[in-house]
Amino acid sequence: MANFKHPETIGLHGGEYRSDPATTAVAVPIYQTSSYQFKNAETAANLFGLKEFGNIYTRIMNPTNDVLEKRVAALEGGLAAVAVGSGQAASAFCIQNVCQAGDNIVSSTDLYGGTVNLFKNTLSMQGIEVRFADPKDPKNFEKLTDEKTRAYYGESCPNPYLRVFPIKEVADIGRKHGIPLIIDNTSSPVICKPLAHG
């Protein structure tokens, strides 16, 4: 895989995609399909059993999305990424993967309004408590932490406040307690790379 340095180049050419093997076109094709043909029943069984990597169904994986995910991971400096339909879907996806009913997260008070609605209404209906900490003092996250805390949450540059979230400080507190920090990086990896800060 090429090691590009500039975000513009990574955005256009990052990930592993170089050209279409059949046509040699350098633009990523848009695959408008929901399903894929399997070589045989054994291959299908291996794919569905997650013993083999490959396309099963577009909702799970699509070659176009695969390129997008690899480029986003490269831009963020991460190992992998998952493309979802919206920022709200990404936030919900992250939290629902670490929490179950009875668990809680500690979130920054500086949040986009839609996220506040997700946290106060949707997650509470699923039995997930959201505790709100003022990020001006990162220790506020630790004060609200207990044995059922599964994640800390913040926005790198929250809308509409634009007060930069103390990523490193909250990540350090999280590491001390074995709690992951989830960052909504809507501001983009061109402006901020949360993984570089903890």
Describe the role of every protein-language-model region.
Residues 2, 11-13, 18-19, 81-198:
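Conserved PLP-enzyme active-site core in the AAT-like
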